[in-house]
Every structure is written in C-alpha cells, then in structure tokens.
Design a protein with these regions (language model features):
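Active-site phosphate-binding strand-loop segment of PLP-dependent enzymes
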Residues: 111-177, 190
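PLP-dependent aminotransferase-like
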Residues: 61, 71-135
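Conserved N-terminal alpha-helix of the aminotransferase class I/II PLP-enzyme fold
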Residues: 17-62, 86-87, 91
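Active-site C-terminal subdomain of aminotransferase-like
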Residues: 196-291, 355
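PLP-dependent enzyme catalytic core of the Aspartate aminotransferase-like
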Residues: 2, 341-387
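Conserved active-site segment immediately N-terminal to the catalytic lysine
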Residues: 184-196, 206
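Conserved C-terminal alpha-helix-loop-beta "cap" of PLP-dependent enzymes
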Residues: 290-362
Length: 387
C-alpha cells in the first residue's frame, strides 16, 4: 500500500516501523537508499575519496569520531591555526584520547600586534614529524577563526612527511567552502566536511572521507564511542552502497535528502566553476575590506577565499552588532589560542553558499553598503590603516 504522504516518499510504504512517522523519510526505504548512494558517489568524485561515512550530528561529531577511532593511546600532532583547530585539543582532553599531543601553532609575522598570521612553516612541520613520528597529524584546511587556508602544496608536503613515518594525515575541511581538496593528489588520508558551508545544505551530519590507506587502517582500530563509532558508520554507508540498509542510530533522513539535492545541483553546475567563483568572491571581499582600512588576520599566501577575518578596534564590529543593525548576520571574532596578544580583536565574514557564489556583485555590494552606513568609507592610503 502507498504511503499516506506522497510529498515525503512518493513510492514509500505505509509507515508502521518503530523508527519514524508518516512525516519522515524511512531509512529502510528505496528512496533513502538512493539518497545515500548519491551522496557517497558525489563525495568520492569531488574529493577523490576511496570510502565515505556519514556521522549524524555536525562537523565536530566527525572530528570526535575520527579522534576516537584513530588517536586512542597514540602520539599525535596538531597544526593549530586558530580556535577551531584548538578544538582537536579540546576533544583529546575531554576524552583523554591520545597518550601525547604535540601542537604546532600559527605565528604572527612581526612584533606589531596587528600584523598578519601564518601557519607553522612547512619546513618546521616536516622536521617535527620526522623527529616525533606521530601516528596521526591533524590539520585545518581552512581555519575559521583566522581566515587562513593551507595550500595544496603545503598539504602534499605534510602528507609525505607523515607517510614517511607510517602515520595518517587528517584534514578538517568543514569550513573549506568550495575549495575542494583532491585526496589522491595531496595525500590526505582522512578528510572531514559538513553540509552547511561548502555544500549549501542544512547541518545534520559530518562527512568523513577515507583514502584507500585509511580504509585499510580502520579495520585494525576500535572506537571509544558508541554513537560516534566511525567504523560502524562506514559499515552503514557500505551497506547502502551494496543496495541494502543497516541501522546503528537514527539518521537525519529528510535533511540528508535535501543535502543530496543541493549536492546534485552543485555537481550539475560544475565543481570547478563553483570553486572559481569562491576564489573570485573571496578576493573581491578582501579587496573591499582592505580598501576600507581593515587588515587581514591571515598573511599573504594563506588567505582563505571562503572566510575573511579582519582586525578591528571597534567593539561593535567585533561582536557583530553594527552589522546586525543593518540586517547582516556576520560572526563575532574569537581567540586563536596561538599566544595572540591581549588586545587581539577581529570580526569574521563567511562567504559560503551558492546564492553568494553565483551572485558575487550582489554579495560584495551588500557588504559595501553596510560599511558605507557604518562610516567606513574608501581610503586613499596605499597600505590599509587600522579600522
């Protein structure tokens, strides 16, 4: 017999399972099996991944799932470029996960308290990996507290150093936007993403992509979590890929169906095209902010196109109140946890989503109008002054 509500699942069954109601997509349905297969195929395509797992929750759930699967009792290393790579340390400490954690912090480029920041030099990272021989290295592709990105060349050298000592490289791509990372060419072993930024979806899960090397390694590991058991969620996805289904905990089926739809929309538009849009929009917004006197927190060569973080001395820009008053939801500045000076004060602008990327002129104009209204007009100075 057909489902009562055709808008949920036109080809669905009458709902009498013990998991869902008629108003939700059943995880055992043919429609949801197709959703999972489509998501997996697209993720494997764009990231050149070998395997995919979806962990219900948010990107941080994926971070913790990876840590509890691969880092228990191990010596690990974290490339910390700000507050959201400090999150690895918070996860480790809360769960008493690794036996030792070595942190390589981003550094300011001069003694000027408003100078730009860059990640630990790749030469130092390589030397530390060779000396310490960590089992796992954790790095942020884009650090949202600093607007800092690690280049493919940087990542490739990190992965080569990690592999030389037999370790794995984990890359947090939750805030990467449309700056897709090719796991095969960069050597990334485990890549973590989420729906709500680069994929223009609603938050509902973490996407964890594994290389062939990591897929082999996970079979020798045991998670210290039940709900965030990454190996179990990998098995769930592999069951869907095989044309069947499996249950661990209840999945956000309707949100995943919506995610699949927007992933297919992005795929049809073109991953390379949307990446170029991300690059161009980021450059335009950075140029705008510098023209109004706002210095970038991230140094040249490390400036992310999807997250722009700038210095300010205005407390109501820092806490986003001035933007809110003009109808814009920006993000307040946060600490870096990288030994920054006491007067460190920033604000953050996110440039995520197809609506912004497909309409760069409109996106920039919204920000320019807000800055005009605040009184931050274009300046003639060659070098940006402090705002």
């Amino acid at each position: 017999m057909p489902a009562l509500l055709s808008n949920i699942d036109p080809d669905g069954l009458l709902e009498f399972s013990v998991v869902y109601t008629d108003r939700a997509l059943n995880h055992m349905s043919k429609r949801f099996q197709g959703v999972m297969q489509d998501i997996s195929a697209i993720l494997k395509d764009v990231y050149a991944a070998h395997s995919v797992a979806l962990v219900p929750g948010s990107g941080t759930f994926g971070m913790e799932a990876v840590a509890r699967q691969f880092a228990h009792g191990q010596k690990v290393m974290v490339i910390r470029n700000g507050w959201f790579s400090f999150r690895w340390t918070q996860i480790f400490d809360m769960g008493a996960i690794p036996k030792q954690s070595i942190v390589l912090k981003a550094r300011q480029q001069s003694t000027d308290t408003k100078s730009a920041w860059a990640p630990c030099s790749i030469e130092e990272v390589e030397a530390q990996i060779a000396a310490e021989k960590p089992a796992v290295v954790f790095a942020p592709h884009v650090e949202t507290s600093a607007g800092m990105i690690l280049s493919d060349a940087y990542l490739t050298r990190v992965s080569a150093a990690v592999h030389k000592v037999g370790g794995l490289l984990v890359l947090d791509c939750i805030a990467s936007g449309a700056m897709w990372v090719d796991m095969k060419s960069t050597g990334v072993d485990i890549l973590i993403s989420a729906p709500q930024k680069g994929w223009s979806g609603s938050p509902c899960c973490a996407m964890v992509m594994l290389s062939e090397r990591a897929r082999q390694a996970i079979d020798t590991t045991q998670s210290s979590s039940f709900a965030c058991d990454l190996k179990k969620w990998l098995q769930i996805m592999e069951a869907y890929e095989a044309g069947t289904h499996m249950y661990h905990t209840t999945m956000p089926t309707d949100a995943l169906a919506q995610l699949r739809d927007v992933m297919q929309e992005t795929q049809a538009y073109g991953f390379a095209k949307v990446k170029q849009e991300q690059l161009e929009l980021g450059q335009q917004v950075r140029t705008l902010l510098e023209s109004r006197g706002f210095k970038s927190v991230a140094a040249e060569g490390f400036q992310a196109p999807g997250v722009v973080v700038s210095y300010t001395q205005d407390a109501e820009i820092h806490n986003s109140k001035k933007f809110l008053a003009l109808g814009l939801q920006t993000a307040a500045g946060v600490p870096l946890q990288c030994d920054e000076p006491k007067d460190f004060m920033t604000f953050r602008i996110g440039l995520f989503g197809l609506e912004k990327l497909h309409n760069p002129g409109r996106s920039v104009q919204h920000l320019a109008h807000a800055l005009d209204e605040m009184g931050y007009l274009p300046i003639a100075a060659k070098e940006p002054a402090m705002a």
